[in-house]
């Protein structure tokens, strides 16, 4: 990391430690709430908060999948625009597991509230309806390797991402508390910071609402 990125990492880590007992919606930076409300993407602040959280988990899923498969990217952000609610910028190929990166946003959203589909028939039915999603669905299907159907590829992606739920959550919360984009070096450091702390109960059980600001 550059010195500037180290300062970003330290500031984000300090904020996450300070807010460790608060739930995800309570840690959303006002910038992301106002950006969604002022831009007309949410009718009130409450749905703006919720939308920011869902987007943060989605983009954090892409980040973790990229890091897990050895792909590179330039930065990640939950800035809402006319074409997307957030973005991981300039992702390079993830090799033969590139499809994992494209599935990761949806998988992370389901890991957030533990709504993954265990039944293969139910998953196949859902996949048949999955379209667009900022290009994720199209890229997922385009990068399936030999020997993979959609369901088997999805299960493979889940096997990679489910053990990394803590990392996804940590990066999602980092995206929520920091009001600007996160460069690759900072996201990688945040990912590595929890890679050896999977047994930390405080990281997995934040349910308190923060005081109104």
How would you name each of these model-derived features?
Residues 2-213:
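Soluble catalytic regions of large protease machineries
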């Amino acid at each position: 990391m550059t010195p500037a990125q180290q300062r970003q990492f330290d500031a984000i880590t300090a904020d996450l430690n300070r807010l460790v007992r608060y739930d995800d919606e309570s840690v959303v930076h006002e910038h992301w709430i106002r950006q969604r409300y002022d831009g007309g993407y949410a009718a009130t602040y409450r749905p703006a908060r919720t939308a920011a959280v869902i987007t943060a988990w989605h983009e954090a899923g892409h980040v973790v999948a990229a890091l897990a498969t050895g792909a590179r990217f330039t930065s990640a952000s939950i800035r809402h625009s006319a074409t997307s609610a957030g973005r991981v910028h300039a992702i390079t190929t993830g090799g033969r597991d590139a499809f994992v990166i494209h599935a990761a946003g949806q998988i992370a959203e389901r890991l957030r509230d533990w709504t993954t589909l265990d039944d293969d028939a139910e998953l196949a039915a859902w996949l048949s309806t999955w379209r667009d999603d900022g290009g994720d669905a199209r890229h997922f299907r385009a990068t399936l390797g030999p020997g993979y159907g959609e369901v088997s590829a999805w299960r493979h992606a889940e096997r990679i991402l489910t053990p990394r739920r803590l990392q996804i959550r940590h990066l999602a919360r980092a995206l929520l508390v920091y009001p600007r984009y996160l460069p690759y070096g900072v996201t990688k450091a945040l990912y590595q910071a929890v890679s050896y702390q999977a047994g930390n109960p405080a990281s997995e059980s934040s349910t308190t609402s923060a005081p109104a600001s």
